[in-house]
Amino acid sequence: MSSNKASFFTRLRRLCRLAVWLFKTGKNLRGIDGGCPESRNRAVIELGRGVLAALDIGLEVGRPAPEHPNGVLVAANHVSWLDIFAMSAVYPSSFIAKQEIKSWPVLGKMGQNAGTVFINRNSRRDIEPINRAVCETLQRGQNVSFFPEARTSSGLGLLPFKAALFQSAIDAGAKVLAVALRYYDETGKRTARPSYADVGLPTCLWRIVSMKKLTIRVDFVCVADAAESEDRYALKDKIEESIRAVVADDADIAV
């Protein structure tokens, strides 16, 4: 009977390639610090693709991103630390991320150079200044991505969205792009193994490199005009419902 896990050699090779990628990236972080938007976007795309390639992770784009100007607030469901790299590989942007990531080796510095806004999820006092910062970033024509669930899920369903950070799109008069992320194993079935909702980063990474094959599917679901929403709650509901429908689409065949 064949194992449904990658061989130990494959796991070790993937970890070694990730270590090499981290080392090389750590020496060239200035590529995403400053410069023109085009060069910064290219650097962000390369970072996203580099991590996925090192770990042998496939990337599929289901519904493509619609044509729209820059300065878009991107909202996605949150499953794994891989979410950021998958999204960056196809749609470069800054991110709103939890404060703990700022201290992560290499990845924290990458986030800072890419313009990531780090937030304390336990402090409501952070919301107003964060919304101002995101609004200003959107008005400069830079895309900003965030995860309105505010924490990771199994990826087979959706946690309730938080409405607070949608206010930045309303204040900026920006568009909001809904993105659905789904993870599949080597059999083509949905999987929750890449999630770190209930495990730490080392365990999550080991689960990922242990999979025979992992594919991330990115669907750009819809675009909402924040100016047409009654308030941030109505805007949140529209985006949440659109993502929930896609995430639930084939979750019944998950393993």
Swiss-Prot record:
Q: Does the keyword Mitochondrion apply?
A: no
- Give the gene that encodes this protein: plsC
Residue ranges of coiled coil: none
Recorded topology in the membrane: Peripheral membrane protein
The primary location reported for this protein is: membrane
Q: Which GO terms describe its cellular component?
A: plasma membrane
Q: What is this protein's name?
A: 1-acyl-sn-glycerol-3-phosphate acyltransferase
Comment text on domains: The HXXXXD motif is essential for acyltransferase activity and may constitute the binding site for the phosphate moiety of the glycerol-3-phosphate.
Enumerate the Gene Ontology biological process terms. Answer: CDP-diacylglycerol biosynthetic process; phosphatidic acid biosynthetic process
State where the protein is found. Answer: Cell inner membrane
